[in-house]
Amino acid sequence: MRIELKAIGLVRTNAQKLPRHWSVSDVEGTLVIDEEYLEGLRDIEAGQRIVVIFHFHRSPAFSPEMLLQTSGQSGKEMGVFSICSPVRPNPIGISVLEVLGTRGANIDVRRLDMLDGTPILDIKPHIEEMPG
C-alpha cells in the first residue's frame, strides 16, 4: 500500500540546539502554514496546546538493521517502536506544543523539538481527556 502525505507548512526557528523531546523544551518558533489552509487555523488560541505531526526530513533512510537502536535516554539497545528516535520506518514525529499566539497563517509556539524547515503534516488539538 502506498500512502502519500502533503506538507501543510513548515517550522521556523532560530534555535541551533534542540532537545530530543518536546516535553523538556523551552524553544520558541513559528509554524508557518500554507495560505490555502488559513481557514483551518480558526479557533486556535494562545494558551492552547496543539499536537503537531511532522516529517523527520533529515533522517537517514531506514533499513532492517535499525529496528534495534540505542536509546538516548537509557543507553540500552531497544526496539525502534519503544523509543523516540527520529530514525524510523516512517519518519514521522509528534510534538505537543504550547500556542503563544497566531498571526494570520503563522502560529507562534513554545516547546519545539523540530529543526528549522521541518515539514508540518498536520495539526490537531491536544485533548487531555475526551468528555462524556
List the model feature ranges, each with a label.
Residues 1-132:
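Glycine-rich, low-complexity intrinsically disordered segments
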